[in-house]
């Protein structure tokens, strides 16, 4: 108390008067707060209710951002109505009109992002079977299939690739409709069914070494429709999309393994009429393939192990010796299935 009196005494007279005015003003405000004003109109409370409802929407809800922006827009509209009709406050109206325009633009953007994306009718099958289970969005799938690929057809009997002639560097394809058969020097190897890669072994084996040619002949056994990518442009695209690169790596590895298993498992064949054609690999044991694949986590290493393990078996069969020796254990291709 003594310190306070000393400070007041040492201050100039005009400053003392200002302090007294401030003290008087504060005391006056305190007396004014004793009388509360009447409750605002119902529209004011509706606006705040909309804000509160938007903030408590759980983030786990799929459309929570759209609902949040919608509730904020509704709350701003109620505030504008309240400011114009019941308060006649221009500043409140301007601020809420600004907030309304910002939230409404964001609301429109979010609704646009949620629009259903159309996928071509011919491509719906491979999307739902191959890409959708791996969480590839329709938008990303359309980017993958809409820029540097095309849908092509082959009539029955036409060839997709000819051994020792067709380059493997040009394309990568997925069969959409029909069925194809793979053969070597007239000997049937295996069939290619819809929703499967046509040339996945060649694509994997020549990632580092270019300039190779097909070592097998791939022929349309029915009227076929396939999706074809330009290999060079696809490679550049996948370099900029690490997620899709891993998806392709997984799908191609799975496709090669499926082709390998299908050699000795007729139930995996799509057409029974192809099962009647003798395959040079039909006498190999499925257990040999399973054991070789189980011995390693890498598909290519497993295939190479399988090749080494089956080369002895093939040498014991005169009708298979010429075929298996033509490939040996060289680069991975359709020949791994023998």
From Swiss-Prot:
<keyword id="KW-0547">Nucleotide-binding</keyword>
<dbReference type="GO" id="GO:0002931">
    <property type="term" value="P:response to ischemia"/>
</dbReference>
<dbReference type="GO" id="GO:0008360">
    <property type="term" value="P:regulation of cell shape"/>
</dbReference>
<dbReference type="GO" id="GO:0090136">
    <property type="term" value="P:epithelial cell-cell adhesion"/>
</dbReference>
<feature type="glycosylation site" description="N-linked (GlcNAc...) asparagine">
    <location>
        <position position="21"/>
    </location>
</feature>
<dbReference type="GO" id="GO:0016192">
    <property type="term" value="P:vesicle-mediated transport"/>
</dbReference>
<dbReference type="Pfam" id="PF04831">
    <property type="entry name" value="POPDC1-3"/>
</dbReference>
<keyword id="KW-0114">cAMP</keyword>
<comment type="function">
    <text>Cell adhesion molecule involved in the establishment and/or maintenance of cell integrity. May play a role in vamp3-mediated vesicular transport and recycling of different receptor molecules. May be involved in the formation and regulation of the tight junction (TJ) paracellular permeability barrier in epithelial cells. May induce primordial adhesive contact and aggregation of epithelial cells in a Ca(2+)-independent manner. May be involved in epithelial movement during corneal sheet formation and regeneration.</text>
</comment>
<dbReference type="InterPro" id="IPR014710">
    <property type="entry name" value="RmlC-like_jellyroll"/>
</dbReference>
<feature type="topological domain" description="Cytoplasmic">
    <location>
        <begin position="62"/>
        <end position="65"/>
    </location>
</feature>
<dbReference type="GO" id="GO:0030552">
    <property type="term" value="F:cAMP binding"/>
</dbReference>
<dbReference type="InterPro" id="IPR018490">
    <property type="entry name" value="cNMP-bd_dom_sf"/>
</dbReference>
<dbReference type="GO" id="GO:0016020">
    <property type="term" value="C:membrane"/>
</dbReference>
<dbReference type="GO" id="GO:0043087">
    <property type="term" value="P:regulation of GTPase activity"/>
</dbReference>
<dbReference type="GO" id="GO:0005901">
    <property type="term" value="C:caveola"/>
</dbReference>
<keyword id="KW-0796">Tight junction</keyword>
<keyword id="KW-1003">Cell membrane</keyword>
<dbReference type="GO" id="GO:0005886">
    <property type="term" value="C:plasma membrane"/>
</dbReference>
<feature type="transmembrane region" description="Helical">
    <location>
        <begin position="92"/>
        <end position="112"/>
    </location>
</feature>
<dbReference type="GO" id="GO:0042383">
    <property type="term" value="C:sarcolemma"/>
</dbReference>
<feature type="topological domain" description="Extracellular">
    <location>
        <begin position="1"/>
        <end position="40"/>
    </location>
</feature>
<dbReference type="GO" id="GO:0007519">
    <property type="term" value="P:skeletal muscle tissue development"/>
</dbReference>
<dbReference type="GO" id="GO:0016328">
    <property type="term" value="C:lateral plasma membrane"/>
</dbReference>
<keyword id="KW-0965">Cell junction</keyword>
<dbReference type="GO" id="GO:0005198">
    <property type="term" value="F:structural molecule activity"/>
</dbReference>
<dbReference type="InterPro" id="IPR055272">
    <property type="entry name" value="POPDC1-3_dom"/>
</dbReference>
<dbReference type="InterPro" id="IPR006916">
    <property type="entry name" value="POPDC1-3"/>
</dbReference>
<protein>
    <recommendedName>
        <fullName>Popeye domain-containing protein 1</fullName>
    </recommendedName>
</protein>
<feature type="topological domain" description="Cytoplasmic">
    <location>
        <begin position="113"/>
        <end position="338"/>
    </location>
</feature>
<keyword id="KW-0217">Developmental protein</keyword>
<dbReference type="GO" id="GO:0001921">
    <property type="term" value="P:positive regulation of receptor recycling"/>
</dbReference>
<dbReference type="GO" id="GO:0034446">
    <property type="term" value="P:substrate adhesion-dependent cell spreading"/>
</dbReference>
<feature type="transmembrane region" description="Helical">
    <location>
        <begin position="66"/>
        <end position="86"/>
    </location>
</feature>
<feature type="transmembrane region" description="Helical">
    <location>
        <begin position="41"/>
        <end position="61"/>
    </location>
</feature>
<feature type="glycosylation site" description="N-linked (GlcNAc...) asparagine">
    <location>
        <position position="29"/>
    </location>
</feature>
<comment type="similarity">
    <text>Belongs to the popeye family.</text>
</comment>
<dbReference type="GO" id="GO:0040017">
    <property type="term" value="P:positive regulation of locomotion"/>
</dbReference>
<dbReference type="GO" id="GO:0005923">
    <property type="term" value="C:bicellular tight junction"/>
</dbReference>
<dbReference type="GO" id="GO:0007507">
    <property type="term" value="P:heart development"/>
</dbReference>
<feature type="topological domain" description="Extracellular">
    <location>
        <begin position="87"/>
        <end position="91"/>
    </location>
</feature>
<keyword id="KW-0812">Transmembrane</keyword>
